[in-house]
Each structure stands twice: as structure tokens, then as C-alpha cells.
Amino acid sequence: MLSQQAFDALGPIFVRHGWVFFGPYRRGQGLSAQAGPYIGDEIDKAKKSGGISAGAATMVRLLATDHLDDQLAGFAWLRNQSFVEPKRIAVAGNSFGGVETVFGVERADYCAAVDSAGGAESWELAPQLQAAMTGAVRSAKAPIFFFQAENDWNLGPTKTLSAVMKDRGKPYIEKIYPPYGKSRQDGHTFGYFGSAVWENDVFEFLDRYCPRARPR
């Protein structure tokens, strides 16, 4: 799916709730096509040369380095914009974006994070990803809302990472919604296109942990 489709679906919803919506293109796609190779192509190359394990290792390495660096650069840029409240920056993502959300909340001072289906498609075959995401939530600096549709590829990420947050005494929400669409891939796109179901829950969470400053 093209990032623009996700931006078109999600942007108006966040704006309606009073948020600035910032959706950067990842390397190799859209407006960032010349910024570096596309992560999907790099994973495919690694799989061809070294199998599933090599592909998983490449995925984790890129998401935890180059792509995380890009996320943190975007966070730093946002904090310096006059139209942004620097202490009210939240991070949210679906699929790879959910993985990035988890990695980002360990490093940046977000007020809250929303992880939809992060790592679901790769979870069972990528113990490296499980370890990296688990390690990140252990050090999470902000509350996280984990959610998935019941028919997503694997519900392990939400259940496992929520359990880690609970064990660490960190604030979180865990939610498994009813099946979305007819296939597992439909379920995996719930974070993009299922806002009619999750909208109230997500923005109640954001309002709780990222309250607007009271006018003086």
C-alpha cells in the first residue's frame, strides 16, 4: 500500500481532533524516493541470499538504525515548529510504522504512542524483532496504546508487549478489536482504514496523556 493512501485516510481524522498530522515518507518511497533504498527491497535481497533469518535481521537492523534516525530527525524538526506544542508530540504507526513507534518511544520524549499491528506479519518468524521490540518497551518513556484487529496475522505483538509494560508498571492500553474485513491482510490494514471503530478509543487515550495546555 502506498503511504499516500494511509495519509489521506488518517490525516483528516487527526486534524478533526485538533492535532497537526505529520506523515513522512520512508526512504525509497514517494517524496523520499531518492533518500535511500526501500526497506522492502533490502529485506527481499537479504532473504534471497540468506533466507528468512537474514531477511528478519535486515529488517530489524534498518528499522532500528536508518529509519529510527529518520524518525528522530522528524521529531526534532517538529519540536522547532511554531505551530507545534513541543511537549504534546505523540507518535503512531501501523505495521512497520508500529515497530518504529515502539523504537521511537524508547528514545524520544513523546507524550504518548499508538502501535497498531507493529510486527504482526513478521512476529512468528523473526525472534530478532521480538527481542528488539520487547527491549524497547521495557525502556518506554511514554504510555503506549497497543491495538490490532482479531484477524491480523499474529496477535503476539500486542499481547506480549502489553505484558511487558504491565510487568514494568508502565501505563498502557491493550485492545483486540473484532475482525476487520475478510482476510488477514484486511485485518492488518485496520489501523489505516478502521478508524470508525478505533477513533474514539485512540483519541481518548491521547487526550488523557497529551492534554492541551490551559490558556492563561
Residue ranges and their predicted role:
Residues 3-24:
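Short amphipathic alpha-helix adjacent to the substrate-entry channel of hydrolases
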Residues 20, 25-30, 118-119, 178-180:
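Short beta-to-alpha linker loops that shape the active-site pocket of alpha/beta-hydrolase fold enzymes
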Residues 28-41, 183:
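Glycine-rich "HGGG/HGxG" loop immediately N-terminal to the catalytic nucleophile
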Residues 39-82:
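Alpha/beta-hydrolase active-site loop
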Residues 83-94:
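Alpha/beta-hydrolase fold nucleophile elbow
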Residues 93-97, 101:
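Gly/Ala-rich beta-loop-alpha elbow adjacent to hydrolase catalytic centers
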Residues 112-176:
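The feature captures the conserved acid-bearing segment of alpha/beta-hydrolase catalytic domains
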Residues 171-216:
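C-terminal catalytic histidine-bearing segment of alpha/beta-hydrolase fold enzymes
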